Amino acid sequence: MSYALLRPFLFNLDPEHAHELTLQLLEKAHKARALGFIYSQQSLPTECMGLQFSNPVGLAAGLDKNGQYIDALAELGFGFIEVGTVTPRPQQGNEKPRLFRIKEADAIINRMGFNNLGVDRLIQNVQRAKYKGNIGINIGKNAVTPVENAADDYIYCLDRVYPHASYITVNISSPNTKNLRDLQSGEALTELLDSIKNRHSQLATEYGFYVPMVLKVAPDLTPEQVDYIANQLIEFDIDGLIATNTTLSRTGVEDLPFGDEAGGLSGRPVGHLSTQIIEQFYERLEGKVPIIGVGGIDSGDKAVRKLNAGATMIQLYSGMIYQGPKLVQQCVEAITSHRDAMML
């Protein structure tokens, strides 16, 4: 069954229930070996952070928080999969309802709150996966951990995921964990990166191999914050930047049903804001740190815009909820055409 036929049924369900049902259906299709007949693997070799990717279109964190559906999702044609956000201990997240569709704007508001089964369960799932491509693991802090002790949670997760990840994302930009975004600014960011990077370097020595570490930031940054973060990325030799997470802005949805719900806004309305932040970071980083662009990508053209803004690769999430899995192929094809045109 095509996603276009399935979508009206799913959109009549509670969003969180629809999310779980979709993943379960995808898993069943994978086990029945049906996905390979529907979706083709897209090849557009890309190098980023010293890693080789089959194509530059990845799955953003949040869709598969516990790494339960890696093999099924990989069959949709992604060049890489990012799982999480995962925390040291399991947590239920915020109270329901906590996920809202804004259909008129192809947008989503969520206040999930890092609901997950804990880092140890995620590692078990990653180990079981047969997928041979790159798997990023997105790590965060538990809600009960004071923000001044956040480094302890990140290091706890870092220690456990290091030998199992292709790259590790330090998520300090979710708006749904109290005070988490404070870690994006000033001394708090410097101290956090200093602690995490020291442990990261120790792990590289202990294991004898290097796993890239990236930082995921919000779109709601001032130019001064962008400058500071860019300097810190270079100072601490961070391997990549994911820009961006969801926004607290309600521009474009303020008068729509559910537009006033608390949480982070994703989907089409965040696209321009995300692209602006990518442009600002690209200018300040001067090519020293690669950028993975995410936010508001719902077409091949939008994917190319992220690359034109300075991104090396992109990630999808909300756009795929509205457009379906074919969006992966559309983005790879658009980027391929863009690259070919650049070489003429």
Curated annotation (Swiss-Prot):
It comes from the Bacteria. Binds 1 FMN per subunit. FMN binds at residues 61-65, 85, 138, 171, 216, 244, 267, 296, 317-318. The active site is at residue 174. Belongs to the dihydroorotate dehydrogenase family. Type 2 subfamily. Its EC number is 1.3.5.2. Keywords: Cell membrane, Flavoprotein, FMN, Membrane, Oxidoreductase, Pyrimidine biosynthesis. Pfam families: DHO_dh. This is Dihydroorotate dehydrogenase (quinone). One of its GO terms (molecular function) is dihydroorotate dehydrogenase (quinone) activity. It comes from Psychrobacter sp. (strain PRwf-1). Its cofactor is FMN. Monomer. Catalyzes the conversion of dihydroorotate to orotate with quinone as electron acceptor. Pathway: Pyrimidine metabolism; UMP biosynthesis via de novo pathway; orotate from (S)-dihydroorotate (quinone route): step 1/1. It is a peripheral membrane protein.
